[in-house]
């Protein structure tokens, strides 16, 4: 299914050192090799044991390589965390374990400026669609998902 305005809640448990993510508004097709080329990513990570992603805007609950969360109420690897993503008319909220940790607007000047300074600068269609699939990332690390629920917002 394709989603534009929605609320997603998912429980996940990360392995030690693990790295994964949840992408939304993903466009798939022959023009794209990977979902991350078009879909903004809510980062899932073991912050303590994944030193390659130590920058704040690459930590758990960040919009990967764009915005750091305001706080980090995550539970360490091996424990269940609850993620929430809410998208309504380009306004996006990231939730972690019941706490609102990040807000941004997909069309704001700040967002567009950050994109130019990020790894997404060369991906012309990244975060452009406004509608698309929701994708759970396989980054090669063990991560478990349960209680995945999506609700459309009218």
Placement of each model-derived feature along the sequence:
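Carbohydrate-interacting regions of secretory-pathway proteins
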Residues: 1-154
């Amino acid at each position: 299914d394709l989603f534009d305005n929605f609320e997603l809640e998912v429980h996940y448990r990360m392995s030690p050192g693990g790295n994964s993510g949840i992408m939304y508004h993903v466009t798939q097709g022959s023009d794209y090799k990977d979902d991350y080329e078009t879909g903004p990513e809510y980062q899932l990570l073991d912050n303590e044991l994944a030193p390659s992603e130590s920058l704040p805007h690459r930590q758990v609950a960040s919009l990967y390589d764009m915005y750091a969360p305001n706080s980090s109420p995550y539970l360490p690897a091996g424990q269940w965390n609850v993620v929430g993503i809410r998208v309504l008319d380009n306004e996006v909220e990231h939730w972690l374990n019941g706490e609102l940790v990040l807000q941004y607007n997909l069309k704001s000047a700040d967002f567009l400026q950050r994109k130019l300074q990020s790894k997404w600068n060369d991906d012309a269609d990244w975060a452009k669609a406004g509608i698309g699939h929701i994708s759970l990332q396989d980054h090669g690390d063990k991560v478990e998902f349960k209680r995945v629920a999506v609700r459309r917002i009218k």
